[in-house]
């Protein structure tokens, strides 16, 4: 009985506590709702009650009455949602109080000086204004910071005067921000110091920029004066047409005006069961590094302005000479427009009706003689225009930097990870290309023509746009000096391959990766890399997984000629397979060579790589090997190139973007500082070259027995013994060398046989 009484008493106590708790929470909800209502009605000043609430708030805090009413709404909302009173003296709330007190003090100090007068009694004067405002709000208006502000300011103003009061207000605000943000006062002042230094440096830079702008403005004025003189000279020249045709002066455009324009801003299939191995991809290196930051374009050096004012004098002289030359040969034509480019000036010549284009083209040597130019290039006709272009080299070449091409590109699209910067065309337009639309690129040119700088510009463009999980690279550099600077960047699948014998193996591994990707596509029912990545996104959303997407792979071969000398068959087969099939798998080739002969750039390779860049070459034969047409033999070198993109019938002349070694190192160091390289073991070439499959020649084993027995090896010996041709005998010797049966060729000495004759046979 006693136990039952205790249990009953315990239950009564528990129920009493729960009732009290519910009652307290209910009271808090009611109080919170009332505070919210007061705040909203007061802020909106709804009716007599709303105006009364607002006037009361104004009586206490004056100009900060809206802040007080908003605080009422926040406090009420907290009480309704959390059903408890907040800790009103927590660290952050104390900081808020100090900020409000600081503003109240500063506002009321301002109110005293400008409204009451410096000698007026603070509290009594404020009280009179507050009472008047309470009953006649529309007649008084501004009451400073209310009675709370008056009480604080009266003390500080009496003790510290105006300046001291303002200092106290600022210190209260700073210390309040420190408590709210958790930043110490020392850190706060250090941040302010850094900001002041930043503003000072910006002001200094703006001052220097102003000097540059002034210099450019003076240059433009000089150019306009020269243009006026050029127009006058052209107008005075004799007309070509005998029928008194009215001559219009040519329009002269300058590429530098486009450089100074405003910069452009820059960086699905139903779900099916898929095996885990089909969703694996590059393991760690393909997962997104969320803290990786792309390099800024500011890491590159700004372009140096080149003075080309003298070129305008030459333009008017050349225009007169061209007209005189055409007239002397009986060709009726007129110059309609002149484009001053970075390295070349193009004169657009419009022939009259009945004048054959071939007649003007045949005058190329005479035009070069008249202009005293070392060489000219004639574009007949200009695509999309009824005019012929005569390109003449400038006296002063204006350098085009990679930074200005990236900054002044209106077609810049940060989502295109393989968009590369090439340079500027003759009209001054920034030339960009999308590697995924090319889809492969052949770069050829003589030594010193700018080929390596172009390759560095392409790689740097990709590093500035793409993160390591978005684009991977395989670099092959038999020269061992051009691409080694990129060792260690996280975008590499494997270290830069410098051994020509391993290059074929590296290309075969890329081919194997391509086949693996197509196997993934077949398992997931997708057709290309974009479709597969969309599939993986859906798979991750449905299964809450984080399977990596496939990155682009860019294979860069810096010197194809060296590879073709060492292992031409294997290299050509791998390049051909990649060129034919790799586009849909997201794999793209960039192949460079300085010897554009047919034994290096074979017909099979050229047929499968439609986009080409030709730098200066020594002969028209080399130009035809690259572009299937002449023109590259007339280029100037130092970055002067012809771009023939896929689908285009005529090449575009471009002055390539320059990139210094220091800029390349700066970009590489920044990228490495963001993320270290994590090479894929499966993509690193082995130390020992792979021997593919079994021997297909049925005479191989008999030939090995003969060589071991005779302890000598030669092609002629195999020809005599087996009565076979030279080619077959040479292939057998090469197969034995690859498998280690015989040693390498040593000139006039016989090959060394590495396999000894067994003792019992001796």
UniProtKB/Swiss-Prot annotation:
ATP binds at residues 448-453. One of its GO terms (molecular function) is ATP binding. Residues 1-20, 741-762 are annotated as: Disordered. Residues 428-624 form the FtsK domain. This is DNA translocase FtsK. One of its GO terms (cellular component) is plasma membrane. Belongs to the FtsK/SpoIIIE/SftA family. It comes from the Bacteria. Signal peptide: none annotated. It is a multi-pass membrane protein. The keyword Transmembrane applies. CDD domains: TrwB_TraG_TraD_VirD4. Its main location: membrane. One of its GO terms (biological process) is cell division. Pfam families: FtsK_alpha, FtsK_gamma, FtsK_SpoIIIE. The chain crosses the membrane at residues 30-50, 61-81, 93-113, 140-160, 163-183. Residues 184-762 are cytoplasmic. Consists of an N-terminal domain, which is sufficient for the localization to the septal ring and is required for cell division, followed by a linker domain, and a C-terminal domain, which forms the translocation motor involved in chromosome segregation. The C-terminal domain can be further subdivided into alpha, beta and gamma subdomains. The alpha and beta subdomains form the DNA pump, and the gamma subdomain is a regulatory subdomain. Essential cell division protein that coordinates cell division and chromosome segregation. The N-terminus is involved in assembly of the cell-division machinery. The C-terminus functions as a DNA motor that moves dsDNA in an ATP-dependent manner towards the dif recombination site, which is located within the replication terminus region. Required for activation of the Xer recombinase, allowing activation of chromosome unlinking by recombination. Keywords: ATP-binding, Cell cycle, Cell division, Cell membrane, Chromosome partition, DNA-binding, Membrane, Nucleotide-binding, Transmembrane, Transmembrane helix. InterPro entries: AAA+_ATPase (IPR003593), FtsK/SpoIIIE/SftA (IPR050206), FtsK_alpha (IPR041027), FtsK_dom (IPR002543), Ftsk_gamma (IPR018541), P-loop_NTPase (IPR027417), WH-like_DNA-bd_sf (IPR036388), WH_DNA-bd_sf (IPR036390).
């Amino acid at each position: 009985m006693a136990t039952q009484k205790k249990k009953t008493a315990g239950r009564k106590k528990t129920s009493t506590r729960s009732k009290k708790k519910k009652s307290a929470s209910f009271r808090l909800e009611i109080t919170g709702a009332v505070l919210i209502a007061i705040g909203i009605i007061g802020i909106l000043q709804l009716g007599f009650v709303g105006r009364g609430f607002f006037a009361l708030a104004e009586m206490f805090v004056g100009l900060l009455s809206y802040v007080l009413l908003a605080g009422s709404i926040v406090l009420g909302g907290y009480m309704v949602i959390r059903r408890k009173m907040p800790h009103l003296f927590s660290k952050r709330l104390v900081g808020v109080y100090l900020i409000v007190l600081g503003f109240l003090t500063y506002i009321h100090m301002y109110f005293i000086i400008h409204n009451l007068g410096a000698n007026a009694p603070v509290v009594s004067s404020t009280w009179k204004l507050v009472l008047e405002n309470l009953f006649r709000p529309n007649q008084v208006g501004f009451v400073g910071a209310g009675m709370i502000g008056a009480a604080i300011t009266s003390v500080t103003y009496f003790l510290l005067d105006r300046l001291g009061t303002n200092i106290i207000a600022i210190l209260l605000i700073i210390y309040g921000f420190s408590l709210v943000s958790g930043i110490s006062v020392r850190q706060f002042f250090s941040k302010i110091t850094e900001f002041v230094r930043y503003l000072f440096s910006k002001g200094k830079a703006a001052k220097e920029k102003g000097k540059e702008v002034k210099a450019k403005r003076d240059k433009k004025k000089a150019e306009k004066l020269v243009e006026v003189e050029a127009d006058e000279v052209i107008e005075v020249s004799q007309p070509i047409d005998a029928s008194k045709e009215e001559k219009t002066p040519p329009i002269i455009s300058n590429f530098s005006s486009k450089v100074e324009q405003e910069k452009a801003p820059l960086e699905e299939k139903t779900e099916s069961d898929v095996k885990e191995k089909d969703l694996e991809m590059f393991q760690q290196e393909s997962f997104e590094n969320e803290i990786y930051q792309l390099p800024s374009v500011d890491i590159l050096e700004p372009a140096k302005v080149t003075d080309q004012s003298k070129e305008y004098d030459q333009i008017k002289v050349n225009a007169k000479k061209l007209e005189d030359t055409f007239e002397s040969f009986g060709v009726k034509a007129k110059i309609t427009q002149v484009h001053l480019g970075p390295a070349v000036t193009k004169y657009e010549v419009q022939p009259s009706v009945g004048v054959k284009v071939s007649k003007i083209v045949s005058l190329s040597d005479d035009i070069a003689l008249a202009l005293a130019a070392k060489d000219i290039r004639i574009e007949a006709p200009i695509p999309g225009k009824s005019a012929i272009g005569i390109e003449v080299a400038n006296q002063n070449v204006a350098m085009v930097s990679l930074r200005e091409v990236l900054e002044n590109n209106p077609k810049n699209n940060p989502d295109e990870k393989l968009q590369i910067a090439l340079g500027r065309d003759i009209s001054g337009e920034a030339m960009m290309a999308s590697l995924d639309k090319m889809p492969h690129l052949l770069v050829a040119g003589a030594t010193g023509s700018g080929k390596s700088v172009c390759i560095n510009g392409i790689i740097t463009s990709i590093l500035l746009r793409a993160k390591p999980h978005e684009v991977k690279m395989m670099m092959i550099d038999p020269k061992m000096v051009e691409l080694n600077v990129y060792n260690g960047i996280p975008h590499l699948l494997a270290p830069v391959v410098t051994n020509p014998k391993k290059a074929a193996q590296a290309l075969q591994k890329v081919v194997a990766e391509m086949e693996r990707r197509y196997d993934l596509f077949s398992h997931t029912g997708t057709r290309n890399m974009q479709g597969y990545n969309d599939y993986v996104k859906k798979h991750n959303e449905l299964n809450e997984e984080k399977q990596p997407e496939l990155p682009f792979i860019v294979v860069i071969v810096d010197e194809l000629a060296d590879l073709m000398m060492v292992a031409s068959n294997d290299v050509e087969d791998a390049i051909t397979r990649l060129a034919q099939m790799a586009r849909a798998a997201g794999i793209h080739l960039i192949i460079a060579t300085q010897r554009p002969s047919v034994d290096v750039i074979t017909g099979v390779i050229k047929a499968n790589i439609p986009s080409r860049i030709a730098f200066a070459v020594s002969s028209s034969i080399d130009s035809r090997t690259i572009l299937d047409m002449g023109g590259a033999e007339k280029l100037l070198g130092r970055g002067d190139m012809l771009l023939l993109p896929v689908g285009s019938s005529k090449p575009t002349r471009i002055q390539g973007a320059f990139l210094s070694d220091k800029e390349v190192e700066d970009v590489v160091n920044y990228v490495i500082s963001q993320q270290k390289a994590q090479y894929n073991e499966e993509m690193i070439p082995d130390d020992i070259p792979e021997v593919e499959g079994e021997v297909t020649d049925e005479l191989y084993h008999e030939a090995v027995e003969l060589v071991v027995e005779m302890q000598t090896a030669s092609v002629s010996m195999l020809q005599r013994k087996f009565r076979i041709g030279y080619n077959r005998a040479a292939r057998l010797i090469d197969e034995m060398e690859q498998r280690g049966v015989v040693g390498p060729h040593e000139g006039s000495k016989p090959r060394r046989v590495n396999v000894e004759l067994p003792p019992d046979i001796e």
